[in-house]
């Protein structure tokens, strides 16, 4: 779990984040260091219940957060990585322009691009991944400069807190009741 904070790069007149901000990358929100926490994922039946409160988008989940979890204090836009599960991903990048993954990869499995004629696939070497997601090829096997290429691998599922769902009461008998929050796939952040 990573707590969100508004990035101070925002324009005071429009509220728009500076697109070239190196801290928030133009998103208007920055995140703190990761912290271990735990939560429960509610079923899709409960997620359909969330549709009554607003738009339901594929990738929305309802989290039930116990009061003894550090995540209990989460707020809007906080990021949550599901450390016990992973999913396949595929990203198209351009060599020399955006050699950087926007999602944290668990592992890379394949890199490929089309040949000059565009009629055959060329397999590349698996690059190293820097902490900021930048890809690097130390011993060759990189795509040609300016060429689009595909990176495939596995990543942890990542969500951001979309809305805190209303509940009648937060306490019972002096104890905090679990919270319910709607979380949305981080891929959809800002859309």
Where are these regions (language model features)?
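N-terminal disorder-to-order initiation segments that are Gly/Lys/Arg-biased
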Residues: 1-56, 70, 163-191
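Short alpha-helix capping/helix-loop boundary micro-motifs
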Residues: 59-73, 136
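Signals and flexible motifs at protein termini associated with secretion
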Residues: 36-47, 80, 96-104
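Extended beta-strand solenoid/passenger and fiber regions
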Residues: 85-147, 152-190
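Conserved SET/PR-domain catalytic core that frames the SAM/AdoMet-binding pocket
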Residues: 68, 77-78, 84
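Loop/turn positions that initiate beta-strands
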Residues: 75-79, 146
């Amino acid at each position: 779990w990573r707590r969100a904070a508004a990035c101070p790069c925002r324009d005071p007149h429009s509220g728009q984040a500076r697109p070239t901000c190196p801290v928030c990358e133009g998103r208007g929100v920055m995140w703190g260091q990761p912290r271990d926490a735990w939560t429960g994922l509610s079923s899709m039946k409960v997620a359909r219940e969330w549709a009554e409160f607003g738009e339901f988008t594929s990738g929305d989940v309802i989290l039930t957060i116990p009061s003894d979890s550090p995540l209990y204090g989460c707020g809007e836009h906080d990021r949550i990585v599901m450390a016990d599960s992973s999913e396949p991903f595929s990203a198209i990048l351009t060599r020399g322009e955006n050699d950087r993954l926007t999602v944290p990869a668990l592992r890379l499995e394949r890199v490929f691009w089309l040949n000059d004629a565009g009629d055959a696939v060329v397999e590349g070497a698996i690059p190293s991944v820097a902490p900021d997601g930048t890809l690097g090829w130390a011993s060759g096997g990189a795509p040609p400069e300016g060429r689009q290429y595909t990176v495939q691998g596995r990543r942890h599922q990542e969500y951001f807190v979309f809305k805190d769902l209303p509940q009648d009461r937060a306490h019972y008998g002096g104890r905090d009741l679990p919270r319910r929050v709607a979380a949305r796939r981080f891929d959809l952040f800002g859309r």
